[in-house]
């Protein structure tokens, strides 16, 4: 437990209480009682700051009753497989303070459309998003899953066939199911990599067996299970040859590496804000071409039979507006850093491979993902190393979690010493080296051979 981290949180919370004072007071000024409360609060903040300087005092434990303080990003190195890319930037955290209220983005909404709001510049952000992923139009959505759903709802009718990877995320299955479609999986083979040839073979199989072509192809650039890179350029080429729309699933790529949907051959690009764009959940992006925008971003045409009301400015597949407050503003606040960090993807891969090389020095450790690594998310196999220790340790598999936590490392699947995942994205070189050394030190402690 880091007392300084806890004191920073404590000071922030006291300042929030003072902020609430102004939210409750009349705009003309504070009453005598409110002024006294304010001054007491300032004194309290001062005492906390003094404790912060000295590194002493009682550490707070909770945000509020029943809600534990979350400090894993400040007090630990977090290697959770799904969290690093969504770690908020300082700008996003500051923006949440100002725009955390429910409909905060709607203060000056003049047209009833999220992507038309000019202050804050949500309209400009949408245009930048489309350019960022190399497409023509974009919308923010409540997570990548809602992007999948918008596309399947627009393109798929009952009985239509959709190709997905045998490593696809469950939300792709559900998006097809809701639309009434039928799933056919593309095999990833023994290397766990989807190729353009495998997609073409599956299309031909579907054509022979079903007598028709698939209506949509949905393939991820990097899967969530292995973090392997799939041949999306090859898939895009095959999709064009057969005239089948291609949805590029960039949940683990958009926001951490350069992505250009048109160069890939995608008709739709879906990204995750909370997974890879340093944004609050649920958030994401759906981008498409001028060809498909009128379909997936179509306007509403329904009207009430009594009132005659209609909502032509709303987009049905998105259920109108999507991210109305802190979610979209966190995406916007982080976006300048996100645009810069994708340029450093090669360095992230260097760090990922450095760690894996060090990790493999421990005899019995294996990497289940493709190697060398092409992503920061990796699946590792420690059956012949740490799991051997777990079999006789009184804490079983939790011994590794205990040892890592003692070294201020969290995020691995607690209790797992067989096959598990980790993600090194965003860690500094100092943290990467510390992480690598920590595993080696644990191995040596339990007399595992280190090469």
PLM ranges: what are they?
Residues 81, 92-147, 153-154, 167:
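Conserved N-terminal alpha-helix of the aminotransferase class I/II PLP-enzyme fold
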Residues 271-374:
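Active-site C-terminal subdomain of aminotransferase-like
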Residues 349, 353, 365-403, 426:
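Conserved PLP-binding catalytic core of the aspartate aminotransferase-like
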Residues 3-112, 317:
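N-terminal "arm"/small-domain region of PLP-dependent enzymes with the aminotransferase-like
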Residues 154-170:
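Conserved PLP-anchoring active-site segment centered on the Schiff-base-forming lysine
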Residues 2-46, 204-205, 340, 406, ...:
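PLP-dependent enzyme catalytic core of the Aspartate aminotransferase-like
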Residues 194-255:
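Active-site phosphate-binding strand-loop segment of PLP-dependent enzymes
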Residues 260-274:
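Conserved active-site segment immediately N-terminal to the catalytic lysine
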């Amino acid at each position: 437990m880091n007392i300084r981290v806890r004191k920073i949180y404590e000071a922030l919370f006291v300042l929030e209480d003072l902020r609430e004072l102004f939210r409750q007071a009349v705009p003309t000024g504070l009453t005598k009682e409110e002024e006294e409360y304010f001054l007491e609060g300032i004194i309290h903040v001062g005492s906390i700051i003094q404790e912060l300087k000295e590194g002493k005092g009682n550490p707070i434990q909770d945000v509020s009753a029943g809600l534990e303080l979350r400090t894993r990003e400040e007090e630990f190195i977090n290697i959770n497989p799904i969290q690093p890319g969504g770690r908020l930037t300082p700008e996003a955290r500051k923006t949440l303070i100002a725009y955390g209220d429910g409909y905060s983005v709607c203060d000056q909404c003049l047209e009833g459309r999220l992507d038309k709001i000019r202050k804050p510049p949500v309209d400009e952000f949408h245009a930048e998003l489309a350019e960022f992923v190399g497409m023509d139009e974009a919308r923010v959505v409540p997570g990548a899953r809602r992007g999948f759903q918008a596309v399947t709802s627009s393109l798929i009718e009952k009985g239509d066939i959709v190709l997905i990877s045998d490593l696809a995320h469950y939300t792709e299955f559900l998006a097809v199911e809701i639309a009434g479609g039928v799933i056919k999986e593309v095999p990833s083979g023994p290397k766990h990599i989807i190729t353009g040839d495998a997609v073409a073979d599956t299309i031909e199989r579907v054509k022979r067996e079903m007598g028709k072509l698939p209506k949509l192809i949905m393939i991820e650039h990097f899967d969530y299970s292995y973090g392997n890179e799939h041949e999306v350029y090859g898939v895009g080429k095959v999709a064009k040859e057969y005239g089948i729309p291609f949805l590029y699933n960039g949940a683990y790529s958009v926001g951490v590496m350069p992505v250009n949907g048109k160069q890939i051959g995608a008709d739709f690009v879906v990204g995750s804000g909370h997974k890879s764009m340093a944004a609050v959940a649920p958030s994401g992006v759906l981008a498409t071409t001028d060809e498909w925008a009128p379909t997936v971003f179509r306007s509403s045409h329904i009207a009430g039979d009594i009132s005659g009301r209609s909502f032509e400015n709303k987009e049905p597949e998105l259920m109108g507006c999507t991210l109305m407050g802190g979610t979209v503003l966190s995406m916007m606040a982080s976006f300048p850093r996100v645009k810069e960090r994708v340029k450093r993807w090669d360095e992230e891969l260097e760090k990922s491979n450095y760690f894996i090389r060090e990790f493999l020095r421990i005899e019995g450790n294996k990497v289940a993902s493709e190697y060398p690594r092409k992503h920061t998310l990796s699946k590792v196999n420690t059956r012949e190393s740490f799991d051997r220790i777990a079999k006789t340790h009184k804490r079983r598999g939790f011994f590794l979690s205990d040892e890592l936590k003692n070294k201020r490392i969290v995020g691995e699947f607690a209790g797992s010493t067989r096959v598990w995942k980790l993600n090194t994205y965003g860690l500094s070189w100092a943290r990467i080296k510390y992480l690598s050394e920590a595993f080696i030190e644990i191995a040596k402690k339990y007399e595992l051979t280190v090469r």
